């Protein structure tokens, strides 16, 4: 068993309407993690959450590039970008937390993907590491040395958050049964898990905490 310490934080990644079944960018079985997110919050002294929070003209949206389709790749502001369906547009229903998700214990919500010309999978930085979300400073100010990540999607936002957390020197756990992946390509989830492990992320299940 791994007991969270007072220097641990639970980070709930992108539990938003557009990422659940029926949403604009649905993660298969994403709804299954909501009860666990509610349960786990009771075990931590600090809980933060993130939201994808895009302007309507965001460069990652295929609809903003005539002739392009979701899944196509372009160069956006100097880095490769996968194009996605329009999702999690600021101040829309799709960008809001799932109604069944208990947000009463969340201490702070961090927004990402707010800049038009660059995406932000990680909860810490944009994809080029040019701007930060404020999460790293928030954790440091509160003496947080380790984090537990869960949410959507495992092979994108959870993975890149874990990699950045390790780069920042945080002891990083990913609660695997609290995540679901998109798996655009077969094997993406397995590759994401392996990449996180190689970076020093500790993979565990809810029952291990």
Predicted regions and their residues:
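Histidine-anchored nucleotide/phosphate-binding helix
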Residues: 37-40, 158-169
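Extreme N-terminal starter segment of soluble prokaryotic enzymes
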Residues: 4-10
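A short alpha/beta connector and helix-capping loop motif
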Residues: 6, 22-52
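Short, glycine/acidic-enriched loop or turn micro-motifs at the edges of active sites
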Residues: 17, 55, 115, 154, ...
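Glycine-rich anion-binding loop/nest that anchors nucleotide
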Residues: 144-160, 174-176
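Structural recognition of alpha->loop->beta junctions
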Residues: 82-85, 99-104, 186-209
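Short internal beta-strands
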Residues: 48-51, 173-178
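Active-site alpha/beta core segments
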Residues: 38-146
């Amino acid at each position: 068993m791994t007991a969270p310490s007072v220097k641990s934080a639970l980070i709930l990644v992108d539990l938003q309407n557009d990422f659940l079944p029926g949403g604009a960018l649905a993660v298969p079985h994403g709804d299954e993690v909501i009860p666990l997110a509610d349960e786990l919050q009771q075990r931590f002294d600090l809980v933060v959450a993130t939201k994808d929070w895009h302007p309507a003209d965001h460069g990652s949206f295929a609809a903003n590039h005539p002739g392009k389709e979701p899944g196509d790749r372009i160069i956006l502001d100097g880095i490769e970008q996968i194009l996605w369906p329009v999702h999690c547009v600021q101040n829309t229903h799709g960008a809001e937390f799932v109604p069944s998700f208990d947000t009463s214990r969340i201490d702070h919500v961090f927004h990402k993907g707010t800049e038009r010309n660059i995406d932000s999978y990680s909860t810490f930085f944009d994809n080029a590491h040019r701007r930060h979300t404020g999460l790293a400073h928030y954790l440091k100010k509160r003496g947080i040395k380790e984090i537990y990540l869960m949410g959507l999607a495992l092979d994108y936002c959870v993975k890149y958050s874990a990699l950045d957390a390790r780069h920042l020197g945080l002891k990083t756990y990913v609660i695997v049964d609290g995540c679901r992946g998109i798996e655009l390509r077969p094997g993406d989830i397995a590759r994401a898990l392996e990449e996180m492990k190689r970076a020093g992320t500790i993979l565990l299940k809810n029952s291990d905490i």
